[in-house]
């Protein structure tokens, strides 16, 4: 093998190695990304049912139902236009309460019931997760346009 052929083979091997590393990195990133949806998008059927997603909105007043004897809880989440039911088994954050903005992570189950694996509550009275605030603002604007 001449020097030129060895150099060409080395360049090809480096390109193949970088391509494989890039492909594996993109695949890992794609599997770990969680898309954000609001209740209107969920009820419209715009949400994949086979992957984990995040849903955000405001907990509907009077909708929180806890089962006695275990940690199961069910509540409704709204973006002021549509409402989706969320079921969760576990300890809710201390700041979780009705009328407050939350983000839940999980999968969409049968009958458009969201099965949460994690629930995140807002931090103080002024804070609302940016995705939830944007979603509520868009929904409010769309609702006002229709009136």
UniProtKB/Swiss-Prot annotation:
Cytoplasmic side: 1-7
Subcellular locations according to the entry: Cell inner membrane
InterPro entries the record matches: CcmE, CcmE-like_sf, NA-bd_OB-fold
Membrane topology: Single-pass type II membrane protein
UniProt GO cellular component terms: plasma membrane
Gene3D superfamilies, A to Z: Nucleic acid-binding proteins
Entry superkingdom: Bacteria
Alphabetic keyword roster: Cell inner membrane, Cell membrane, Cytochrome c-type biogenesis, Heme, Iron, Membrane, Metal-binding, Signal-anchor, Transmembrane, Transmembrane helix
Signal peptide: none
PANTHER family given in the database record: CYTOCHROME C-TYPE BIOGENESIS PROTEIN CCME HOMOLOG, MITOCHONDRIAL
Biological function: Heme chaperone required for the biogenesis of c-type cytochromes. Transiently binds heme delivered by CcmC and transfers the heme to apo-cytochromes in a process facilitated by CcmF and CcmH.
Protein name per its UniProtKB record: Cytochrome c-type biogenesis protein CcmE
Organism field: Nitrosococcus oceani (strain ATCC 19707 / BCRC 17464 / JCM 30415 / NCIMB 11848 / C-107)
């Amino acid at each position: 093998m001449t020097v030129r052929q060895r150099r060409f083979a080395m360049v090809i091997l480096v390109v193949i190695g970088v391509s494989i590393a890039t492909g594996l990195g993109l695949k890992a990133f794609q599997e770990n990304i969680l898309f954000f949806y609001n209740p209107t998008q969920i009820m419209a059927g715009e949400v994949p049912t086979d992957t984990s997603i995040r849903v955000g909105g405001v907990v509907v007043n009077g909708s929180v139902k806890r089962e006695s004897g275990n940690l199961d809880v069910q509540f409704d989440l709204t973006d002021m236009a549509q409402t989706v039911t969320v079921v969760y088994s576990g300890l809710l954050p201390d700041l979780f309460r009705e009328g407050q903005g939350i983000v839940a992570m999980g999968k969409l189950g049968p009958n458009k019931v969201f099965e949460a694996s994690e629930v995140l509550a807002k931090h103080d009275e002024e804070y609302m997760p940016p995705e939830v605030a944007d979603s509520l603002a868009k929904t409010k604007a769309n609702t006002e346009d229709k009136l």
